[in-house]
Amino acid sequence: MRSKFKDEHPFEKRKAEAERIRQKYADRIPVICEKVEKSDIATIDKKKYLVPADLTVGQFVYVIRKRIKLSPEKAIFIFVDEVLPPTAALMSSIYEEHKDEDGFLYITYSGENTFGDC
């Protein structure tokens, strides 16, 4: 999936920003979170997050749910490289496995399970 953030910001600028963030906040992970294009779920008010390394994927999903004011009965799925990450996984391990060459971790979210097959 194409990232709007990548389209709007040149690679060198993104890389420099991620490096600056990692130097200043070594215990935090720079995350870009965007809605899957054709999803009917609410659009998030901000794309850029500085996430504690020890946060779990489930805790991050909770943050996203709050930001888009999603009611408890509605489903939300987050994807990293078009795969559903394990809820108990630490954001630091997801970052190490899936960070982009620019230094950001790109996460997409949707109201439906568009990529996974579970």
UniProtKB/Swiss-Prot annotation:
Q: Where is this site: Cleavage?
A: G116, D117
Q: Which UniProt keywords apply?
A: Autophagy, Cytoplasmic vesicle, Lipoprotein, Membrane, Protein transport, Transport, Ubl conjugation pathway, Vacuole
Q: Which Pfam families match?
A: ATG8
Q: How is it modified after translation?
A: The C-terminal 2 residues are removed by ATG4 to expose Gly-116 at the C-terminus. The C-terminal Gly is then amidated with phosphatidylethanolamine by an activating system similar to that for ubiquitin.
Predominant cellular place of this UniProt entry's protein: membrane
State the Gene Ontology terms under molecular function.
phosphatidylethanolamine binding
Subcellular location field? Cytoplasmic vesicle, Autophagosome membrane; Vacuole membrane
Q: How does it sit in the membrane?
A: Lipid-anchor
Q: Look up the record and give one Gene Ontology term from the biological process aspect.
A: protein transport
The source's superkingdom equals Eukaryota
- Please give the GO cellular component terms listed in this UniProt entry: autophagosome membrane; cytoplasmic vesicle; fungal-type vacuole membrane
InterPro entries xref list: Atg8-like, Ubiquitin-like_domsf
Could you list the residues that carry lipid attachment of the Phosphatidylethanolamine amidated glycine kind. Answer: G116
Which residue numbers fall in the propeptide?
117-118
What PANTHER family has UniProt attached to this entry?
Answer: MICROTUBULE-ASSOCIATED PROTEINS 1A/1B LIGHT CHAIN 3-RELATED
Task: Give the function comment from the record.
Answer: Ubiquitin-like modifier involved in autophagosome formation. With atg4, mediates the delivery of the autophagosomes to the vacuole via the microtubule cytoskeleton. Required for selective autophagic degradation of the nucleus (nucleophagy) as well as for mitophagy which contributes to regulate mitochondrial quantity and quality by eliminating the mitochondria to a basal level to fulfill cellular energy requirements and preventing excess ROS production. Participates also in membrane fusion events that take place in the early secretory pathway.
Q: Which family does it belong to?
A: Belongs to the ATG8 family.
The protein's name is: Autophagy-related protein 8
The gene from which this protein is expressed is: atg8
